[in-house]
């Protein structure tokens, strides 16, 4: 009897864990869809169509809506103002299973970030030199904020007061005061910065320098680069692990995923081929999702052992910026 009760309890706990697992929403670029993945089973559970050339993606904090950017833009005609809307943001309602609306925007967008209160979505527009600010209360672009040449990636602090934008063409990171929507400071970044991730306490920013094959560590208080890690050619995606100290970084041209202990500096390497690309740690699961730039798949990697434990076969395209929603 006791053994039966124990078995039932374990099954119940397992079921509760599965129910509590996050959902991961993933844009598939050239496949023109966004998918939903159950992080407990790594199974694709939904597909949202007509999301054209989506690269960046965020979810509202309650998981009710997704906002995706697009690389697709219509060329401007001679004489048209530069701020003429010629691209799109897609507003997706997962419960309804489709794109609910589209928001016109000037210029293709690369990556997205959302404020913790779910009010604003910031999109980087690399060819325009600014971030656009979508107000989700009105579903309109409220403003644009010039940041520098080729803005790539945005981080927003947990308190919602500041945003940091990497400018690949300006070789810097800028800080935006979200109360005034003005750039208030310029930070070092290493050469041609792209993807970024905060340390757990937000005291440091880890930023990729793809051309230099390294990750720079920026002290947020001083704005100075205080350390760097040599990772390999064409570093791309990065994220911090569940333990708050392990940084996972992909190097496309060396076909590897690197796990860096940010306290000791020790590195572990996992070969992944071809071309590991975007990645996300899936908080609470011990997993890292790593996409391939060349094949429609995602490797599921165990954070502790750095071994591939599953592979998600995608319906097409390539996986880009992922949004993780905790159930």
What residue spans do the PLM features occupy?
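Predominantly soluble domains enriched in secretory-pathway, periplasmic, or organellar proteins
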Residues: 4, 10-327
């Amino acid at each position: 009897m006791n053994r039966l009760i124990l078995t039932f309890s374990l099954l119940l706990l397992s079921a509760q864990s599965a129910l509590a697992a996050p959902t991961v929403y993933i844009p598939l670029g050239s496949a023109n869809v966004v998918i939903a993945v159950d992080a407990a089973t790594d199974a694709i559970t939904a597909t949202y169509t007509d999301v054209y050339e989506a690269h960046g993606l965020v979810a509202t904090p309650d998981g009710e809506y997704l906002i995706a950017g697009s690389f697709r833009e219509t060329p401007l005609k001679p004489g048209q103002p530069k701020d003429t809307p010629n691209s799109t943001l897609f507003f997706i309602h997962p419960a309804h299973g489709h794109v609910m609306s589209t928001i016109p925007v000037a210029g293709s967008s690369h990556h997205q970030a959302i404020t913790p209160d779910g009010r604003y979505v910031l999109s980087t527009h690399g060819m325009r030199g600014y971030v656009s600010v979508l107000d989700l209360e009105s579903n309109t672009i409220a403003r644009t904020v010039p940041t520098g040449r080729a803005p790539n990636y945005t981080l927003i602090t947990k308190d919602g007061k500041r945003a940091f934008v990497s400018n690949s063409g300006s070789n810097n990171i800028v800080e935006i005061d979200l109360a005034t929507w003005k750039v208030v400071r310029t930070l070092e970044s290493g050469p041609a910065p792209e993807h970024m991730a905060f340390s757990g306490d937000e005291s440091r920013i880890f930023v990729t320098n793809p051309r230099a094959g390294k990750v720079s560590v920026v002290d947020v208080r001083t704005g100075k680069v205080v350390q760097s890690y040599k990772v390999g050619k064409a570093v791309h995606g990065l994220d911090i692990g569940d333990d708050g100290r392990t940084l996972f970084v992909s190097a496309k041209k060396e076909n590897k995923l690197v796990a860096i202990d940010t306290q000791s500096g020790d590195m572990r390497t996992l070969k992944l081929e071809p071309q590991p690309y975007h990645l996300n740690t899936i908080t609470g699961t011990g997993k890292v999702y790593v996409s391939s730039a060349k094949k429609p798949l995602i490797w599921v990697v165990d954070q502790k052992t750095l071994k591939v434990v599953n592979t998600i076969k995608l319906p097409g395209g390539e996986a880009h910026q992922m949004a993780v929603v905790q159930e």
